[in-house]
UniProtKB/Swiss-Prot annotation:
GO terms for molecular function: G protein-coupled peptide receptor activity; growth factor binding; growth hormone-releasing hormone receptor activity; peptide hormone binding. The gene is GHRHR. InterPro entries: GPCR_2 (IPR050332), GPCR_2-like_7TM (IPR017981), GPCR_2_extracell_dom_sf (IPR036445), GPCR_2_extracellular_dom (IPR001879), GPCR_2_GHRH_rcpt (IPR003288), GPCR_2_secretin-like (IPR000832), GPCR_2_secretin-like_CS (IPR017983). It is found in: Cell membrane. It comes from Sus scrofa (Pig). Disulfide bonds join C41-C64, C55-C96, C78-C112. Residues 1-22 form the signal peptide. The chain crosses the membrane at residues 131-151, 168-188, 211-231, 241-261, 284-304, 332-352, 358-378. This is Growth hormone-releasing hormone receptor. PANTHER family: GROWTH HORMONE-RELEASING HORMONE RECEPTOR, PDF RECEPTOR-LIKE PROTEIN-RELATED. Residues 23-130, 189-210, 262-283, 353-357 are extracellular. Receptor for GRF, coupled to G proteins which activate adenylyl cyclase. Stimulates somatotroph cell growth, growth hormone gene transcription and growth hormone secretion. Pituitary gland. Also detected in the lymphocytes and thymocytes. Residues 152-167, 232-240, 305-331, 379-423 are cytoplasmic. Keywords: Cell membrane, Disulfide bond, G-protein coupled receptor, Glycoprotein, Membrane, Receptor, Signal, Transducer, Transmembrane, Transmembrane helix.
Amino acid sequence: MDSGVWAACIFCLLSSLPVALGHVHPECDFITQLREDERTCLQAADRMANSSSGCPRTWDGLLCWPTAGPGEWVTLPCPAFFSHFSSEPGALKRDCTTTGWSEPFPPYPEACPVPLELLTDEKSYFSTVRIVYTTGHSVSAVALFVAIAILVALRRLHCPRNYIHSQLFATFILKAGAVFLKDAALFHSENTDHCSFSTVLCKVSVATSHFATMTNFSWLLAEAVYLTCLLASTSPSTRRAFWWLVLAGWGLPLLFTGTWVGCKLAFEDVACWDLDDSSPYWWIIKGPIVLSVGVNFGLFLNIIRILLRKLEPAQGSLHTQPQYWRLSKSTLLLIPLFGIHYVIFNFLPDSAGLGIRLPLELGLGSFQGFIVAILYCFLNQEVRTEISRRWHGHDPELLPAWRTHAKWAKPSRSRAKVLTTVC
């Protein structure tokens, strides 16, 4: 097998691997580097054409062979990419004969081996992950649509807390739609070269994906901020705070995404805008996300501290099993609502831990919207009570007063009022 066929086999497998974690698969770096090496090699060959006797500078599909005199042997190492598959660096030799360059020795498959079956298995693995996250986002979108419809249709559930839940639900739906749009743009054909693919639809899908991701993180943060203010506030009025959260939750992601799009158009308008690992402009998107996850985690710990204090008996410390259960239940409910699981990978490089990161962030993460809809709508006692009242036609006048008004307990020792019911 000559170098051209060997390079074509590798390109065919690598360029068809799916996009992972919102970025082109790392092997695309190898293909991009090869294309840059080819361009440099051919430009140098054009400048040196007919400048000397012997063998001219030549690109064979993987390596650039320099000019050489008759009878001269040239040795070059395998491209750096092949070191991932072999502990010993390979090398090739070519002889400059009177009739031109000889064939590389040893042949490329022997000098620079690549387990093609491994790449095939990797492609199959990514396809499976894609099926899982497509299913997850689809299920989540349907559940979230139903949850929003319930919160909007039942007027007794109209309150700032549920308004914020609805905004968060909407961001999960937007995120699912962005994933479907991106997949449609990138994977509409099996023959598409994902490493160099570049269309307006592709760039729009990537920008939409970034905006959806940022809005999702911003409303996860809004949930944490709102609950913190609710637990610590001395005033039951929260509607003004809600509108500030709306402005920040949608406005800031739009501002950062618009800035990123402007920078890409002006300074880095290449490929499909998803080669971001080495781009300084990527931090316009990633920086606010990392910051929001860090702040969210801090607020999560603070809320657990507040809950621990409020569950503490007057005489002593928390020690009874029911109180431990209440605290554990509250903590577990906050994890999907605040997206605390993102702390695990959010501070690592995008290419780190792909083997674990893909199933967790793409697989389980796609079901996060479904879990949030279940916990904060379908299993919510107020929602179930209101649906039951509507279903059985109960007279609203017979409902207890706490169903329609906010009730505030007396100040605790810490002088913070405890909200027992919001709606």
